[in-house]
Amino acid sequence: MADRSDHLVAIVDDDDAVLDSLRFLLEVAGARVATYHSASDYLADAEVRPDCLILDQHMPDMTGLELVERLRADGVQLRVMLITGLNSPPLRGQAAALGVTKVLEKPPTEQELLEFIAGPG
């Protein structure tokens, strides 16, 4: 397995079970992981500089796409995986327009996660 210890992956999801399972899978693969329960929590952590971001689409304070839109407006360019229970063509179109790397239905597979964090960038 490739060395992923230099990758910092930020995960933003309001569901503790999802955060815990994604963190576990990525840490076992050797990635460093930072987790956040909301988009606001992520934005408040000025120190974080992840290599990639895994976002839930449906969160109480801000959707995943709203967070991506804000990051792009601030000039932040990083790879983003959007995970959702409702993967519709309009959502995929909006995500593509914002430069989201991947849109996947929950739960993403271990292979999908590992390929994403190992990707370019």
What is each model feature region?
Residues 1-10, 16-17, 23, 43-44, ...:
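Non-catalytic signal-transmission and effector/linker regions of two-component phosphorelay proteins
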Residues 35-52:
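Acidic, metal-coordinating helix/loop segments flanking the phosphotransfer/catalytic sites
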Residues 59:
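Receiver (REC) domain active-site loop signature in two-component systems and cognate sites
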Residues 66, 87-102, 115:
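Alpha4 helix (beta4-alpha4-beta5 surface) of REC/receiver domains from two-component response regulators
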Residues 65-77:
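Short amphipathic alpha-helix used as the core "switch/output" element in two-component signaling
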Residues 37-38, 63-66:
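Acidic catalytic/metal-coordinating carboxylates
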Residues 16-34:
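Two-component/phosphorelay signaling modules centered on CheY-like receiver
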